[in-house]
Amino acid sequence: MFWYLKKNTALFIFLFSGCLFGELVDGDTLVLHPITWNTSSPEGWNAQYKKIIQFPGSDGPWAKIIMVQTLKCDSTTKGDNYPCGEWDYIWNIFVNVPKEDTVETFSMGSFVTPYGKRLWLGGEAGWEWTYDITDYAPILKEEREIIVGNNQELLDLKFLFIKGAPTRNILRVENIYPYGHHKYGDLADDIVLQETKLQLLPEARGYKLKAVVSGHGHAGPRNCCEWDSKTHTYYMNGSELFRWNVWKDCGNNPIYPQGGTWPFDRAGWCPGTKVDEYENELTPFVKPGDTISIDYEIEPYLDNGEKEGEFRISHQLFSYGSPNFMNGAEIIDIIVPSSKGAFSRFNPTLSNPKVIIKNAGAYDLERVEIHYGLKHRRKSVYHWCGHLKFLEEEKVFLPIPNWHGLRRTQTFEVEIKKTNGVKDENPLNNILTSTVPLPKIFPEEFILEIKTNNRDRARENSFTISGNNGTVYYSRGFFKDSTEYNFPIELKRGFYEFLFRDDMEDGISVHWWNRNSAPEKIGISGELKFLKWDGEVLHEFKPDFGQELKFGFIVGPIP
């Protein structure tokens, strides 16, 4: 399926003989929809979808290329007996590119599915993840085979090609070390992924290294390499260039609860997330046309069996032209307020909006004028000051806007008006909207009921109830095991946030994973709920929440 959407309209243009009827202008989005809910689930163990896709040949340049991956639980999947796959399975997004009389395979990202037992994955709408794959523009042309997903969940896949000038033109993408599975010992002993020479593209003016690394297996006393943090390093011409640690905090995973040990940190991934990507700008260290030696290394292993663990790795080099804009800032995303599943841990809320901005211009970014608020309402203005070099990003907390009118419109807008005191050169990435999820409405008086768990775990918990002005109205910690607490709460009209923490990041649920090895350590689950004075439940939380719970609510009417 192939169509495009005119900016701010719903005009469909069909593909015929490789050409589009109609001309794309900056801001238009060309949509490819090769896999839908109706596409048959692949057959075979952990089988992937394979699709031949006709990508656009010449209708660029593309300001952005976004891949939208949506998964949902469905009994028609062929992987196992559950609507969603029972275990956490890793898969890649591969694109096969013709190269002389063979093909070269590029990985555009890696993903790990969530534990599927008793999993809610967005219901019929599914759960959405987005990938910015603009850097792969040189290979997303004409006919290509895409290999993606698996048969544990149903997959819906779209590619969005947004017409316009990118931050800098992407000239070439190369595999330094193509995607592969490697034993930790082989990596550390330099048996695989040895030093290699690269000829930098002479006509390029910028270069970037990208590594996607995830640890797997349960070797040695620290269960390497899924559960063990290791240091990874790039060397150039024999000298250390970039060093990073592969480790990911999973305690605030937005997909919860899951039927597995989802809250615990892992080597570069969590169940239900994309594998972390590590990008390093090579430009300051090289000159166009240089021949360089690149070597990837990992910290030495200990003689305890851990070398049998595994890493799944790809390393790529991207070559670019000069920046297309001198003064330019981009709104990458709106974290708060947002209805996106990825940000559900922070929403709903009517506290400070939180956005991500990026310097998309060659000049250092020092000032940004940001207008924001509800659509069709008077906007607030915030003057950000800081220092971001080209391509650097920052999360910005905006002062709380006027939420009056929220009953009539839940569309929130953020717009960059000026960068460094002048008009931004690229208006295409200056405005973004989100949907404001409405918080629950509570009475002025209610009860917070907490039933603690046992095995000395209650002391890990604490809570606060605070207002939009930052004032903490209620707080408590140092709970006793196996005890019921009832806190009478009385608040005036306004917006409030309840925060409940667990220091060990394992929620207040039972430790069910001890059922075979140490059943005496399973313990009991705690309970956490808000009640009216007559006992009616206002809101009840699931005990398997990981690190913390944030819950916003309104006392009084919606503004």
Predicted regions and their residues:
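Exposed beta-strand face motif in extracellular beta-rich ectodomains
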Residues: E142-R144, D290-I292, E394, R408-F412, ...
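Bacterial Sec-dependent N-terminal signal peptides
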Residues: M1-T29
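Short strand-edge motifs at loop-to-beta-strand transitions and within beta-strands
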Residues: Q194-T196, E392-L398, L432-S434, T483-F487, ...
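Extracellular/secretory-pathway and virion-surface proteins
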Residues: E23-S339, S344-T349, A360-Y363, K423, ...
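Loop and turn regions of beta-sandwich accessory domains that flank beta-strands and are enriched
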Residues: G109-T113, L119-L121, K248, N253-P288, ...
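Beta-strand signatures of extracellular beta-sandwich domains
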Residues: N92-F94, T233-Y235, E369-G373, S462-S466, ...
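Short glycine/proline/serine/threonine-rich loop/turn segments at secondary-structure transition edges
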Residues: D135-K141, V286, W403-F412, E505-W512
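Extracellular/luminal regions of secreted and cell-surface proteins that mediate adhesion/ECM remodeling
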Residues: S40, E299-E445, P559
